Amino acid sequence: MDKSESTSAGRNRRRRLRRGSRSAPSSSDANFRVLSQQLSRLNKTLSAGRPTINHPTFVGTERCKPGYTFTSITSKPPKIDRGSYYGKRLLLPDSVTEYDKKLVSRIQIRVNPLPKFDSTVWVTVRKVPASSDLSVPAISAMFPDGPSPVLVYQYAASGVQANNKLLYDLSAMRADIGDMRKYAVLVYAKDDALATDELVLHVDVEHQRIPTSGVLPV
């Protein structure tokens, strides 16, 4: 073999080695595959826990259904003694109740703790009789009644509790905007007294879209 053949053979061997090294799996490729598998399993777990019609559950951010919008009601509970109750009907603005036959699909409660919050509260939504004055004895009798879920929200030393929302699906009931006055948000200060500067409640009522005015208010 002459010198030129030896040099050519050496180059071919180096080229084959370089091609082989590029195709060999690296540790970063293996780590990426493991991470992808973990993310896939996490997505399956999260999707399995989404709320259904028959199982209200905690949610993060929900989009309104097509053709629907929402109206929010804000309530700041007064001082509630330990072991006592507070209730307020879901009274929507007149501009919304004017369209009382528009269907309501869902109700969502959002608990917004203020900086001084250091208590434990139980929050729920109940359908209440029109004659009810939402007194403490009346709420006490209604609170444990029925299958409606309850949000237990409590102070956490490491920060606010992550689960601060509860969603109710009313689609099967064919409830409408006019029915909302028959519902009330109820609060139970089970273990601690609740001060007036500890908590704000937001109730989001998802309903069919209503016409909006094109004229600015006077």
Curated annotation (Swiss-Prot):
Disulfide bonds: none annotated. SUPFAM superfamilies: Positive stranded ssRNA viruses. The modification N-acetylmethionine is found at residue 1. Its main location: virion. Residues 11-21 have a biased composition (Basic residues). Capsid protein. Probably binds RNA and plays a role in packaging. Belongs to the cucumovirus capsid protein family. The N-terminal arginine-rich stretch does not seem to be the major RNA-binding region that allows formation of an infectious ribonucleoprotein complex. This is Capsid protein. It comes from Cucumber mosaic virus (strain Kor). The lineage of its organism: Viruses, Riboviria, Orthornavirae, Kitrinoviricota, Alsuviricetes.
